[in-house]
Amino acid sequence: MARLGLGPAWRCTFSNDICDRKAASYRAYFGDAELRVEDVARLKPKDLPGNPTLVWGSFPCQDLSLAGNGAGLDGDRSGTFNPFWKLMRGVIRLGRIPQIVVLENVVGALTSHDGRDFTAIVDALVQEGYRVGALVMDAVRFLPHSRPRLFIVAVHQEIAVPSQLVCPDMSEPWHTTSLRTAYGRLPEPLKDAWIWWRLPIPNDPIPSLASLIEEEPTGVEWHTKEQTDHIISLMSPLHLEKLKKAQLLQKRVVGTVYRRVRPNEDGVKVQRAEIRFDQISGCLRTPVGGSSRQTVVVVEGRRIRSRLLSPREAARLMGAPEEYPLPIKYNDAYHLFGDGLVVPVVGWLSANLLTPLAIARRVMIAA
């Protein structure tokens, strides 16, 4: 999905994923000329073609996310950064230096192991001659989807970075408190190699959640009354009150529900259905258990309907085009988008930072 966001200005020469199901969707849309389905740890520098301007790495978030096990870069999944960077070091040793490196992950990467994982990533980049900066970009600025993600953008020291791409100091909204804290933990030599990237703030209209919801969805069915009643029975008084207020509006209101484990008034952990009507979807997650799949609730006065979020709705919340092919199986589709990148977020980063950096490189060479 990074390729979708980068757009036609960038030509993809190599793509890698370990998941056959994701690869099938990629092939259906892009073809498979540059796709290699393989564990990144088994790739060799000779497998990567040419002299890349940009290398993009999105490594699994499970060991870094708030819902993960806290293993950080030592975990089996998020630990794929290490073989990825070993591969990049091999490419660099061959004199094929990527001019720009982008690493994407959950914001938990900033605090994992008290910030030591983030420091290790920055140090790895700086040791290979890169200047490094980072941004926290939330999909909610582009789509009705709360999905903050960390983007580490590194540029090789050979590139003269245009001044308009740099902030003199940290600034909102891209440089959040957690990012500033992580930066503050860096040793001085790494701070010396740091760049506070500048990005404009998007001001295009954001579609409402209701506008993305299908009345006749494909891949899911509306719940029975008993199933909907069960979801309502899991709501706390606070969330029941939200539901009641939506009913009093006497019009079609769309909300979403995630199930979460919360302590009750006696301190006992129980499952709760938490509903929101702010026209923002909760962050899509990979479908590990029923509670990780988001439920759509449509309220029309006394009538309340519910069902799982459909595959096409998940694709829309990630900004994928309508013609993007969906996996046949529900969980495969939900996994594809729950583990993916939000297309307009990548597009904004590409148009306002990555492409200008690439142009600066070409201008420098021409000069």
Residue ranges of predicted features:
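Short loop/turn segments at strand-loop or loop-helix junctions that form parts
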Residues: 58-60
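Active-site catalytic microenvironments for nucleophilic, acid-base chemistry
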Residues: 8, 90, 352-356
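Short acidic, glycine/proline-rich loop/turn micro-motifs
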Residues: 6, 66-70, 296-299, 330
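Class I S-adenosyl-L-methionine
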Residues: 45-52, 62, 66-276
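C-terminal target-recognition/interaction regions appended to catalytic cores
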Residues: 212-367
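N-terminal Rossmann-like NAD(P) cofactor-binding module of classical short-chain dehydrogenase/reductase
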Residues: 54-56
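SAM cofactor-binding core of SAM-dependent methyltransferases
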Residues: 1-42
